[in-house]
Amino acid sequence: MDWLATRLREAGKTVLVTREPGGTPLAESIRNVLLAPSDEKMADDTELLLVFAARAQHLAEKIRPALERGDWVLSDRFVDATWAYQGAGRGLDQDAISRLEALVVRDTQPDMTLLFDVPVDVGMARAGKRAALDRIEQEDRAFFERIRQCYQERAGNEPDRFRVLDASCDLDQVRAQLQPLLEEMLTWS
């Protein structure tokens, strides 16, 4: 994200780099609740509602104002993550997710979605190298297989929006895959 934001800024673009859940003080507080390991099991519906609560705040406070100014927004995750994690990963009701998306996201949709795809074993190994796993990172392999499959299906169903990158390679190779996408983005008005 930082590499892409730097290249866009060098091309004269004003760029907001953000993440979900999070991106504002309130949304970051919700993120902390979502990700903190706890002895109390969080209900799946609670997780879904918290994700959308953080997103509503993020859209209102950061994303929509940036877009209204004509800024570019690079977000590490957005609504596709909800379909993957809460929809496929948790098996939550698709209609409920659709209704929440319509209520919260409305017509604020990405122009392009970059899917940094890695085999589940690679992703889990990378996460395992961090100091401590968060609540979601502690899930089992089957959970992450469902998530990856959902992302791949969404990318296949929306090829005009998604660009799939092989993120199992080293950082320089990932950046090499990003370069033509950056050039494509810079043709946008």
Question: Which ranges hold each PLM region?
Answer:
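ATP-dependent small-molecule kinase phosphotransfer cores
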Residues: 11-105, 177
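A glycine- and Lys/Arg-enriched "phosphate-lid" helix/loop adjacent to the NTP-binding pocket
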Residues: 82-149
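Conserved anionic group-binding/transfer micro-motifs
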Residues: 51, 114, 174
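Active-site donor-binding loop signature of nucleotide-sugar glycosyltransferases
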Residues: 20, 53, 118, 138, ...
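NTP-dependent small-molecule kinase module
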Residues: 3-7, 121-189
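A generic structural signal for alpha->beta connector loops
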Residues: 12-14, 70, 110, 159-162
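Hydrophobic/aromatic beta-strand patches that form the interior of the parallel beta-sheet core
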Residues: 18, 74, 112-114, 163-165
